[in-house]
Amino acid sequence: MPYANQPTVRITELTEENVKFIIENTDLAVANSIRRVFIAEVPIIAIDWVQIDANSSVLHDEFIAHRLGLIPLTSDDIVDKLQYSRDCTCEEFCPECSVEFTLDVRCNEDQTRHVTSRDLISNSPRVIPVTSRNRDNDPNDYVEQDDILIVKLRKGQELRLRAYAKKGFGKEHAKWNPTAGVAFEYDPDNALRHTVYPKPEEWPKSEYSELDEDESQAPYDPNGKPERFYYNVESCGSLRPETIVLSALSGLKKKLSDLQTQLSHEIQSDVLTIN
């Protein structure tokens, strides 16, 4: 078997926003499965239900609701404790399966009033817009991080609403995608020729390239197979990047375990039927 050894992982960079790591001794199918799990199977919290009580802005209600759903919310401290709303015993919403937000803004000045994620008031200090995190403790921490614009109001216009954030994952809707981007490459020097460059010498080199400065791509390797994968996982801010990776691998492991259990039951049932 070409990949009989256990896969190995090496982290090359870890910041507040992204993590870069290398996985070796595996194949392309496994590597791509991991990438897809990062995007679609890691649960976070996002606004899913909106009741608009007053809206005299230029945007229709559905535009407002859509924008609210895409505002990333901090989920690190609560996502594992919150139930999915479909599994909760409550009739609509409760603290066990949701977080309530309110917004009440009216423009009384001649100057345009920007309604942003900062105006969203949460009933839980653990679930707030990512851009509002740590503002109360140190207002200088996020000076360069602008609040997310929802709508602009002119004098006399108002927006008043109530919303509930729920737990979900990216396979249901993009607002539950914890990543801003997930990328991996496996042939930094293009030795496999899976990519054809019109002018290789003009193409920017990968940060993982091992070629000399005067070389544009490696010699063609017709028998080569991808077995080393360079990942870059960027978080949208809802979860720390390392939390995304660990949660994704845990979810993938559970899926494989459930599949193994189900297959074992099927095999035992067939054996009993034959006997």
UniProtKB/Swiss-Prot annotation:
Question: Mind telling me which Gene3D superfamilies this protein's record contains?
Answer: DNA-directed RNA polymerase, insert domain, RNA polymerase, RBP11-like subunit
InterPro entries reported for this sequence: DNA-dir_RNA_pol_30-40kDasu_CS (IPR001514), DNA-dir_RNA_pol_insert (IPR011262), DNA-dir_RNA_pol_RpoA/D/Rpb3 (IPR011263), RBP11-like (IPR036603), RNAP_Rpo3/Rpb3/RPAC1 (IPR022842), RNApol_insert_sf (IPR036643), Rpo3/RPB3_RNA_Pol_subunit (IPR050518)
Q: Superkingdom, according to UniProt? A: Eukaryota
Q: Which GO terms describe its cellular component?
A: cytoplasm; nucleoplasm; nucleus; RNA polymerase II, core complex
- Keywords assigned: DNA-directed RNA polymerase, Nucleus, Phosphoprotein, Transcription
Q: Which GO terms describe its molecular function?
A: DNA binding; DNA-directed RNA polymerase activity; protein dimerization activity
The record, for Pfam families, names: RNA_pol_A_bac, RNA_pol_L
What SUPFAM superfamilies does the annotation carry? Answer: Insert subdomain of RNA polymerase alpha subunit, RBP11-like subunits of RNA polymerase
Q: Where is this region: Disordered?
A: 203-226
Keyword Phosphoprotein among UniProt keywords: yes
Subunit text: Component of the RNA polymerase II (Pol II) core complex consisting of 12 subunits: a ten-subunit catalytic core composed of POLR2A/RPB1, POLR2B/RPB2, POLR2C/RPB3, POLR2I/RPB9, POLR2J/RPB11, POLR2E/RPABC1, POLR2F/RPABC2, POLR2H/RPABC3, POLR2K/RPABC4 and POLR2L/RPABC5 and a mobile stalk composed of two subunits POLR2D/RPB4 and POLR2G/RPB7, protruding from the core and functioning primarily in transcription initiation. Part of Pol II(G) complex, in which Pol II core associates with an additional subunit POLR2M; unlike conventional Pol II, Pol II(G) functions as a transcriptional repressor.
- Protein family: Belongs to the archaeal Rpo3/eukaryotic RPB3 RNA polymerase subunit family.
What does this chain do? Core component of RNA polymerase II (Pol II), a DNA-dependent RNA polymerase which synthesizes mRNA precursors and many functional non-coding RNAs using the four ribonucleoside triphosphates as substrates.
What's the protein name? DNA-directed RNA polymerase II subunit RPB3
Q: Which gene encodes it?
A: Polr2c
